[in-house]
Amino acid sequence: MESFAPTRKGRAVFSADAAATAAPGSAGAGETLDPAKDALIIVPVRGFVLFPGIVMPVVLNGPAAIAAAQEAVRQQRSVGILMQRESGAEEASPLNMHRFGVVANILRYITAQDGGHHLICQGEQRFHVEEFLRERPYLAARVKRIEEPDERSPDIEARFVHLQGQASEALQLLPQTPPELIAAVNSAPSPGALTDLVAAYMDASPAQKQDILETIDLRARMDMVAKLLAQRIEVLRLSQEIGRQTKASLDERQREMLLREQMASIQRQLGEGDGKAQEIAELTEAIAKAKMPAEVEEAARKELRRLERMPDASAEYGMIRTYIDWLIELPWSLPEEAPIDIAEARRILDADHFGLDKIKQRIVEYLAVRKLAPQGKAPILCFVGPPGVGKTSLGQSIARAMGRKFVRVSLGGVHDEAEIRGHRRTYVGALPGNIIQAIRKAGARNCVMMLDEIDKMGASAHGDPGSAMLEVLDPEQNSTFRDNYLAVPFDLSRVVFIATANMLDTVPGPLRDRMEIIALTGYTDREKLEIARRYLVRRQLEANGLKPDQVEIDDDALIEIIRGYTREAGVRNLEREIGRVLRHVAVRIADGSASHVHVSRAELTELLGQQRFEDEVAMRLSVPGVATGLAWTPVGGDILFIEATRAPGHGKLTLTGQLGEVMRESVQAALSLIKSRAAELGVDPESFDKTDIHVHVPAGATPKDGPSAGVAMFIALVSILTGRLVRNDTAMTGEISLRGLVLPVGGIKEKVVAAARAGLTRVLLPARNRRDYDEIPQDTREKLEFVWLEKVDDAMAAAFEGMAATPAPN
């Protein structure tokens, strides 16, 4: 059967008479139901319950509801308003319909201009569905109509009076209650009618209203409505109380503002008290403009009220004023962030730093992630490396690339937790901690904060600042960081934290676990030369008031400064020495003795004095018992001389040079290995009991430790016991085992760079360190010959290659 379609569009009202005169062949007209069989046309509704005696608009959803309503209008019949069990169901079917509904008369059928269909219905009587007779094109069912009981017993009357009182109270609590509704409640003809009236207009869920409709017993129904109405009255009372309090608060604030204005006007006329009143007014305005969170603003206004009541001469007046100033001046709101330009970030990093390709690539990756996920929790980078390699300047470059403010917090020597969290205001001279002070200095809540020298914090009786830093660097906690001085939470989650350290040994494990470690190694001589050309000379020219056309420094002179006057992993001393050279030049130009100065290698002795570092390798390796090891230090790699000598004695082993426990064990392991191979090496096994051996590692004032010198110890001992010289162009590193294996060690890049810097041409490295070969700079690889060691036999073959045996000195 086709669905009903009106023949005239835009018609707003269908009456029963008009529908009756519709064309008999209209689509949707089905066979007429027999009223005698209690057959009822069902209009399905969603999320709506109609009660007997109530006139309500009914929204027609879906073709079944529209067809049912139009057929009922055509036949001039009542309909059954029945709610669907699932309001989200598209099609009405017997399976998703409730079984209790209300018989209703259609007072009006409305077709709106937007195409919607509505009925104005008046509920008449409850019914129960006994059987659905049809499903398409509309629902029809055989129903049992339920008569409303007319009881007037005392308990019913008592409930009636109670419910009527509740309804009147609820209507009084509601704003703008229609008078007709009040009159309907007061003139309800019966307890059942009152109950249905209250249920219809009560703020309850459709499910609760359906339960009321299905409750046939009048007492139970009245109790159910009374209970729900009592809950609603309580909600209305609370809402009204909250509204009164809010209005009272606003009225009090307006009254206070008016009184203050009047007081200020009187004071201005008298010429008294202008200063403090103006100060309070300025602070009030500043608090309003600071865009503080509600909790912080409440704390600020509370302190402002205390300040207003306090005499100016009070000692506490200045403390409160300082506290309010801190709250006002902190950046509580988040500024707009410019998008990160990755290409511009690369340009900035390349312009500010030479080399460091892998470090810069990691920073670019970090910035790319920040760009794509600005709300994400980015890792906290920690740059670890020797002094002067550019850790702090990398942080400044990151800030420039992100377009953010940069601020630096020095943690070196901090040993008090209050330096991080601040002092409580009860102490004289209390201030916030370094973190909050840095935020205020930056003036932005999304700044880049450099935590410099994080490895140099120390615990004391005043607490452990390292533990306080755990909260600062934890993305899960720092959004509510609470400084002891402020005593209110401050959001640090948008701060980009970057830490620096020279070494990780002194950084607590939990703190180290919160950071991503990025190691910066020392520069090669070629890299230092390029850095001097591009940055250091230019910076020192500007610092000393010189112009580029007044001074020219040869590359040979710069190389000589690098090798003879500075021996460091970074370039800090190199810049200092270049500054010394240019100050000498500035004197010549300032006194008029020269207008252009050319600095060559030959002039360095005159300008800087004698070289501070000399090549001692050849001299030290001129006797047996001396081997050159390679060491890693916090300031980069270095060469390490191992000296051994022997003398008649009783088999005593002496170790000097401030050797650590691991290094001492390396010497003992090397000597035990030699004893086990004495026959192979040509050493008399009985000579060990008649010989005292002394191993020394200069410089004696510097503590040394680690397993890296095992190979060098072994070669030095073999050299002194066999009288063979070690090649003077060879350095070595590696740990040894009692089986004669050479084990891998760390710091290969720094050690190899140190060997090249010292003028050596061969390095002996553990074969299992081949994976570190790619980390070595290309220019350093080109200068050196690499020998890879599996066993100590490989080390002896390479160290003694081409060297003759000479009598070992006694």
From Swiss-Prot:
Homohexamer. Organized in a ring with a central cavity. This is Lon protease. It is an enzyme of class 3 (hydrolase). It is found in: Cytoplasm. It comes from Methylocella silvestris (strain DSM 15510 / CIP 108128 / LMG 27833 / NCIMB 13906 / BL2). Induction: By heat shock. It catalyses: Hydrolysis of proteins in presence of ATP. The keyword Transcription regulation does not apply. It holds the Pfam family Lon_C. The lineage of its organism: Bacteria, Pseudomonadati, Pseudomonadota, Alphaproteobacteria, Hyphomicrobiales. The gene is lon. Its EC number is 3.4.21.53. The active site is at S708, K751. ATP-dependent serine protease that mediates the selective degradation of mutant and abnormal proteins as well as certain short-lived regulatory proteins. Required for cellular homeostasis and for survival from DNA damage and developmental changes induced by stress. Degrades polypeptides processively to yield small peptide fragments that are 5 to 10 amino acids long. Binds to DNA in a double-stranded, site-specific manner. Belongs to the peptidase S16 family. ATP binds at G385, P386, P387, G388, V389, G390, K391, T392. One of its GO terms (biological process) is protein quality control for misfolded or incompletely synthesized proteins. Keywords: ATP-binding, Cytoplasm, Hydrolase, Nucleotide-binding, Protease, Serine protease, Stress response.
